[in-house]
Amino acid sequence: MTAITGVILAGGQSRRMGGEDKGLLQLHGQPLYQHVLQRLHPQVDQLLISANRNLSQYQLSGVEVISDSLPDFPGPLAGMLSALQAMKTEWAAFCACDTPFIPRDYVVRLCQQKGNAHAVWVRSVQRDHPALALLHRDLAGPLEDYLLRGERRLLHFLLQEGGHAVMFPDDESAFSNINTPEELTSLGAR
C-alpha cells in the first residue's frame, strides 16, 4: 500500500462551542484531538495537524502543525488545501478533531474502496461525512481554484472531482462529531 499522511483538521472557529478550540476540549481527561491522533496514527505513515490557533498546544503532541494558507478560517477545505500542499505523500486521510471514535480500520477501508477516484469519503447509515475523507495530492490545484472562487461546500467539491462515498455500516457513533457543549457532556458520560 502507498504511503499516506493522516491529517487532523483542528482549524475551525467552533462557533457552536462558544468559540472554544474544539480540539483542545477535554474528553475522558485528554484533548479531543488526542483521541483522534491515537486512532489515526497506527493507520498512516505520517501525521499533520491543521490548526489556526493555540499552535503551541498542538505542537506538544510532537506532530507537525500547519495553518491555513488562506486567511479568515474559510472552512475545512482550507485546512485540506494546506495539508495537500505540505504533505510528502501522494494521499492524505482527513479526520476532524471532534470525531474521537473513528474506526481503527478507517484508512484501509477507504483505500480498498477508492478505485481510480482521487477522493473518497465516509458515508454512514444516516449521512455523508465528507470531512472524513481520503484525497490525492493532485487535488491541491483544483481545490485552490475552487476556494479562490469563493466556494466552501466540501461535498460539492469532492463530487465535482469525481469522488464517491464509501459505505461504513458501523455503529453510527463511530462518526459522531461534537458540536455543542451538551454533546461533549453526553460523550463524557459514556
Where does each model-flagged region fall?
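Nucleotide and nucleotide-moiety/phosphate-recognizing core
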Residues: 1-151, 156-175, 182
